[in-house]
Amino acid sequence: MSKKKMTVPDFKKYKQEGRKFTYVTAYDYTTASIVNESETEVVLVGDSLGMVMLGYDTTVGVTLDDMIHHIRPVVKGAPDTFVVGDMPFGSYQESPEQAIRSACRILMETNCDCVKLEGGAAMAETIRRMVEVGIPVMGHIGLTPQSASSFGGFKMQGGTPEGAAKLVADAKALEAAGVFSIVLECVPSGVAKAVTEAVGVPILGIGAGPYVDCQVLLTHDLLDMYGDFTPRFVKQFAHIRKAMVEGLNAFHEEALSGQFPTPDYSFNRVVEGYEVSVSYTHLTLPT
């Protein structure tokens, strides 16, 4: 399958045309190459790699070097897919100058297509400065995992009139600052609809209902690869973890029983002095 890679201007164009698209995650070359073979338009190398790939309890421990290390192979594996590089906690909050330096490192050292950072109106000035120097920025509001502890954990946001109004205001502030799209995470469907209608840039929803411009899920969640926890908003479209365990167990059983390897999976060249009698269950060396 061949697909045309999205560009930054395409995001707004898709929204204007009412064209939906999808957005998943990858943290390594192999997964990225699989995503690239699919019809998925956007892939994020998220700081969620801390929890999914490194076993951390939160995303906070992920470093800028970690992100660059994982973004590089995804860019190589998904040349026809728009690649988003996440900015980790502590790499942009200090000042606009720090954010610009960190974003430039990500873009220069990985060749990804944009950076994503978390935060609402409070981050607008930082984003404005980044966009002014030519950095394409994707915003992220609602549940922002890097600051989840201040919300009391990974919980739905915008569940009150005040909270909903703040999300709309945050989205408008980010649009005014120059983001080309905004991730909206874990909010009620009606609130997500209001946010989506309030701005001209696409809203990319994860756990945000059906009215957003783009649906987002973590690949490890939607393919049932992670295993430890599945958010309530995730539908599992395949069960890859189960298939992998079954395959590993089948290999283990055949290797121990002698069913594997058969001659079909062996090098059968005859070497003088080392002839063997081959069966499907054992090899016998000459005495």
Locate the predicted segments by residue.
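Alpha/beta catalytic cores of nucleotide-metabolism and tRNA/nucleoside-modifying enzymes
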Residues: 1-2, 101, 219-271
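N-terminal amphipathic alpha-helix/helix-capping segment at the start of soluble metabolic enzymes
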Residues: 1-23
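Alpha/beta enzyme core
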Residues: 8-11, 23, 27-56, 60, ...
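Acidic, proline/serine/threonine- and glycine-rich low-complexity intrinsically disordered segments
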Residues: 277-279
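Conserved small/polar residues in nucleotide/adenosyl-binding loops
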Residues: 281-287
